[in-house]
Amino acid sequence: QRQMCIRDRSEYEGWYCTPCESFWTETQLVDGKCPDCGREVKKAKEEAYFFKMSKYQNKLMEYIESHPEFIQPESRKNEMVNNFLKPGLQDLCVSRTSFTWGIPVEFDPGHIVYVWIDALSNYITALGYTPEEKGELYNKYWPADVHIIGKDILRFHTIYWPIMLMALGEPLPKQVFGHPWMLVGDEKMSKSRGNVIYAEDLVKHFGVDAVRYYSLHEMPFAQDGTITYEVFISRFNSDLANTLGNLVNRTVAMINKYFDGEIQSGDVHGDFDDDLKAVATGAIDKIIKKMNTLHVADSMDEIWKVVDRANKYIDETTPWVLAKNEDDKPRLGTVLYNLVETIRIIAALLSSYMPETSKKIAEQIGADDLSFESTKTFGETKAGTKVGEAVPLFQRIDAEKKLAELEEEFGQPEEEKIEIAPYKD
C-alpha cells in the first residue's frame, strides 16, 4: 500500500458522489452535480492519504500518444485527454476515515482503502500478484489484451489504473475499450422511472438468440444504442423471421419438393454463382478484422451481407422457374446446392453470435462442419446429403398483439423506450 502512496496523509476537502464513490473538484462538477451520473454531491472533509497523480501525468500522456490503440473508441480517448490529463491531474484521495467498513490501510488501520484502489487492484491480485512474488497466473494472463468496461468508469481504468501500474512498475493492459450504453432516449436506465426490462423477460418473450442478435447488432461501436419493444419486434420480423428464416425455409422446402430432400451436386455452372461464392467465402476475414477492433455490430453486418446475397441469388436464378423444365433440373440442383452451401457457411459464421440458431440451421441442412476455417472453402456440403423438414427458425410476431401482452405484463406504455438490465436483483 505504501509503495503507491506518494504523498503523506493530509486533510481532503472536496465534493463526493456517494453512488459513484467518486471525488470531484469544483471545476469538474456539471451544474453543481456529479459529471458522471448527474446526481447531487456533498461536501466532504476528512483526513486521508493521497496518491500524487501529477508525478505520472506526463508519462501517461506519452504512453497514450505512443500507443494510439490504448483507449478506444477514439472519442473516449479524446474525452480522457482533454477533460482530465490536459487540465492537470489532482492528487487522488486513496483512503477514507469517515467509515470503518472496508480494507484497513496496513500501516495506518484508522484509514480504509478507497474502494477504487481496492477494486482496480483486484485485476492483478486475483491472479496471485504481490510486489514480492508475481505468481504463475499473473505471468500467464497479465497484461490483459483488453479491458472491456462501461464508458462511465473509463476514467478509473484509463487514468487511475494505468498510473497505479506505473507506480508499481507493472505493464499496462494493451487496450481499454469503453463500451456504450443501451439507452432510454438520451438517459440511462432507471428503476425510479419504471423503464427497466430484464434480459430474462426478453428471452421469455422472444428467445435467447433474438436477444443476442438485437444486443449485438444494435449497439454501435462508439455511440449509445437504444431499444424499444416496437423496434425489437420489427427487427425480429424483418431480420430474423424474414431475411434469415425465409432463406433457410425456402431452400430446404425446395430441396424437399424438387429432389425428395436430397442435395444434388453443384457442377452445372451458371450466372451469379461466382459472386455468391465470393461473398460467402470472403466474409470470415472481414468478420475477424471487425471483431479484432471490437466492431461487433459491424461484424454481424458482414454475416447479413451473405444472407442478403443468398436471397438475391434466389431472385436472380428463379429456381421455381427452372423446376418447370426437366432439362433445367441439373441447373436447379446446382442452384439449390449453392444455396445450401451458403447457408452452411452462414450457420458457421453465426455459431459464436447465435449458437442455438446455428445449430437449428445445421440440423435442417444436415451440416457437420461449422468451423470458421470451413467457411473459406465453398463446396464442403456433400452431394446426397438429406435435408430435414423445413421448420421456421423464427415465427413472425403479431406486433399489436405482442405489444398489448407486454403492456399488460409489465405495465409499460407501448411506445416507452426501455433498456436491458442483465439480471434481476
Predicted regions and their residues:
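Long, amphipathic alpha-helical stalk/connector segments used for oligomerization, subunit docking
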Residues: 220-223, 227-231, 236, 251-273, ...
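Generic structural concept
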Residues: 241, 245, 277, 281, ...
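Cys/His-rich microdomains that often coordinate metals
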Residues: 7, 24, 41
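Basic, alpha-helical terminal appendages of large translation-related enzymes
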Residues: 11-15, 25-37, 289, 293-294, ...
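Short, small-residue-biased leader/transition segments that mark boundaries at the very start
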Residues: 2-6
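A glycine-rich phosphate-binding loop feature that marks nucleotide/adenosyl-phosphate handling sites
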Residues: 13-20, 180-182, 231-232, 264-271, ...
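Short, glycine- and charge-enriched coil/turn segments that flank and shape catalytic ligand pockets
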Residues: 31, 66-68, 108, 131-141, ...
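Structured secondary-structure scaffolds
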Residues: 19, 36-37, 43-257, 299-303
